[in-house]
Design a protein with these regions (language model features):
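Hydrophobic alpha-helical positions that pack around
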Residues: 365-469, 475-480, 488
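Ferredoxin-type iron-sulfur electron-transfer modules in oxidoreductases and energy-metabolism complexes
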Residues: 508-519, 529, 533-593
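Loop-to-transmembrane alpha-helix initiation sites
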Residues: 90, 111-115, 136-138, 176-183, ...
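Long hydrophobic alpha-helical segments that form multi-pass transmembrane helix bundles
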Residues: 105-150, 157
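N-terminal signal-anchor module of multipass membrane proteins
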Residues: 1-57, 249-259
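Alpha-helical transmembrane segments in multi-pass membrane proteins
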Residues: 19-26, 41-53, 57, 70-81, ...
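Iron-sulfur-cluster electron-transfer modules
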Residues: 256-383, 388-406, 555-559, 563-568, ...
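C-terminal ends of transmembrane helices
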Residues: 2-7, 51-62, 96-108, 143-152, ...
């Protein structure tokens, strides 16, 4: 089943490039003050650059794509070539966009910075007045606007500034020199280009330092400044091609935070019970561990966090584990912003959950029993149950990430938590154990979240396995529109008329179909890889899949993907990256089978 996030980041490559363009425009202020005719020249260069890019995109993709990146390239050349004849500057723009970008496949595919590719031949053809910029404090607005872009490749940008600063200290330059020499300009707008600069911290810092040092030490010739950055571009290209080939050892919790979705959470709303079966709390009885296990097996209790794994087998694995210390974690995190039924259960059926917990404790001896939540409520906890609040990041509720966060134990991809003596059960699974043992009930019902993103609002429903998704949605939100189901907002799929609730469904929602613009203009920003809990080179895998090179993509270990959807959510190019990674993962698994 192909799942995808129903929500996406509001940021895009176009937003980022428009902000860069604004900073580039600000660097022209002192130039325009000297020669107002340069305003017309700037507009001509930018228009020419965008025209070339539009034509190339139509020829390659058979459709229009935003050409703001071409405007940035033309703007950079305009700022650095003041005094060069107009025909030479136009030639530089053409060289930059054709030989610096389009011959490599377009935006995001180029190994060299297009602006510098266009500037390099001009350095041989014309005499440049150095430094690049006029001696004016009017450069300050451009410098201030460009500083935030250090965050894109911070190590390289800071390294460049340190390199130029080292030369300044040696020669006693005044602070104004850092502006007119172009140090801030290059550090923030050129060597932070995510397409052509590596994300490796040490190499980025070192390469940036050497490029910055050369750029000022040989101030008499800008050729050194440009060629040193281009050489670093080539080094970065080789490094980035090799990134992600090392097999991921363990999952990591990224810094990805997802927005709150609902204006009305539904935590205080009445349960929508579609089972026609009353939920009855029963008195606690004493059961031998063997009887508890037998009833769990007979009731076919399964993991209700979304995986649907057999709880009886999981318990046996923990019991048989050779681990000296065993832990029991009740997972109530709900890191997906679309879910709320686990928190609702803790509020309304906490006593039943504690009863289920004690039944499980009768089966094995645990050093600690821990309840993990994202937002703690005022719940009376039983004795010896430890409460642990985890970071509000996605996907903090994933089993191995939770173990790492709570127990400070990092498990490799091959290690199974239950075999290591760690039992992680969703709070609804624990409730289901309570019903199975004390109520002798089959695990054929479940609580789930039903939502309508058009309002946006959600509520908790109790349904029977096998019920049609559309019927449940109609009962909760009549006439609400297109239906989706799955593990949450980040792991949803389109619900057809005959789609039913199975063990893996804990979320049903009416929502507009997500708009993935599927832009081919990946900027190489690396946000998808940074937000991947498995540490995969997501953009590289996706590019290879699109090129029909799934065997080559296998070298980047797509089988380690946990299908969390973080990459699709955060992609600034609007690509459904998780779908590409899943294709590569499926190809690898089929090959191994």
């Amino acid at each position: 089943m192909n799942t995808f996030p129903l929500i996406r980041t509001k940021w895009s490559n176009e937003h980022m490039m428009a902000a860069v363009f604004l900073a580039v425009v600000a660097y022209h202020i002192p130039i325009w003050r000297i020669a107002s005719s340069e305003i017309a020249v700037f507009l001509l260069l930018v228009s020419a650059g965008m025209l070339v890019d539009v034509i190339a995109n139509i020829l390659r993709f058979k459709r229009l794509w935003c050409s703001v990146s071409a405007a940035v390239t033309a703007g950079i050349l305009s700022a650095l070539t003041f005094g060069v004849p107009l025909w030479g500057r136009l030639l530089g723009v053409l060289i930059a966009l054709i030989f610096g970008k389009q011959v490599w496949g377009g935006t995001g595919k180029n190994p060299l910075n297009p602006g510098l590719v266009g500037l390099l031949p001009l350095l041989f053809m014309f005499h440049f007045n150095l430094p690049f910029f006029p001696n004016s404090w009017l450069l300050l607005p451009g410098a201030i606007l460009s500083l935030p872009f250090l965050l894109i490749r911070p190590y390289t940008g800071i390294g460049y500034l340190v390199g130029t600063g080292a030369v300044m200290l040696q020669y006693g330059f005044n602070p104004k020199e850092i502006l007119i020499s172009g140090s801030v300009f290059f550090a923030c707008l050129v060597v932070t280009d995510p397409v052509t600069i590596t994300r490796e911290p040490f190499i980025g810092m070192t390469g940036g330092f050497l490029a910055g040092f050369a750029g000022l030490y040989f101030l008499g010739s800008p050729l050194y400044a440009v060629s040193s950055i281009l050489a670093f571009n080539l080094l970065s290209y080789g490094i980035e091609r090799g990134r992600g080939k090392a097999e991921p050892e363990q999952l990591r919790l990224t810094k990805l935070k997802l927005p709150k979705i609902y204006t009305h959470s539904g935590l205080n709303s009445q349960l929508l019970d579609l089972t026609s079966e009353a939920v009855r709390l029963q008195c606690q009885k004493e059961f031998a561990s063997e009887e508890v296990l037998n009833r769990i097996r007979a009731a076919e209790v399964f993991g209700m966090g979304g995986a649907g794994f057999d709880t009886y087998r999981k318990l046996l694995t923990v019991i048989d584990s050779k681990a000296e210390e065993k832990y029991f974690i009740l997972n109530g995190v709900e890191c997906d912003p679309g879910l709320l039924h686990d928190r609702w259960l803790l509020r309304n059926f906490s006593e039943a959950i504690w009863s289920g917990m004690k039944l499980i404790q009768a089966c094995a001896e645990f050093k600690e029993v821990i309840l993990t939540v994202k937002e703690p409520d005022t719940i009376m906890l039983p004795e010896n149950l430890k409460l642990c609040q985890v970071a509000s990041r996605y996907p903090a509720g994933a089993e191995k990430l939770l173990i790492s966060e709570v127990l400070r134990k990092d498990l490799s991809r091959e290690q199974i938590p239950a075999e290591c003596g760690v039992l992680v059960l969703n709070v609804q699974t624990v409730y289901s154990v309570y019903e199975a043992v004390l109520g002798n009930r089959k695990a054929d019902t479940r609580f789930l979240t039903v939502a309508n993103l058009r309002i946006p609002e959600a509520r908790v429903a109790r349904v029977k396995l096998g019920m049609k998704v559309h019927e449940i949605l109609q009962a909760a939100y009549p006439g609400s529109g297109t239906a989706f189901a799955g593990g949450g907002l980040m792991q949803a799929y389109t619900a057809e008329d005959e789609t039913v609730v199975d063990r893996n469904v804990n979320f049903i929602v009416a929502a507009p179909f997500p708009k993935y613009k599927e832009s081919p203009q990946c900027s190489g920003c690396g946000v998808c890889a940074d937000n991947c809990p498995a540490g995969l080179a997501v953009n590289r895998i996706a590019d290879l899949v699109e090129a029909g090179k799934k065997k080559e993509a296998a070298g980047y270990h797509p089988e380690a993907c946990i299908s969390c959807g973080s990459c699709s959510y955060s992609c600034l190019a609007g690509r459904n990256l998780s779908l590409r990674v899943k294709e590569a993962k499926t190809a690898v698994l089929e090959q191994h089978n």
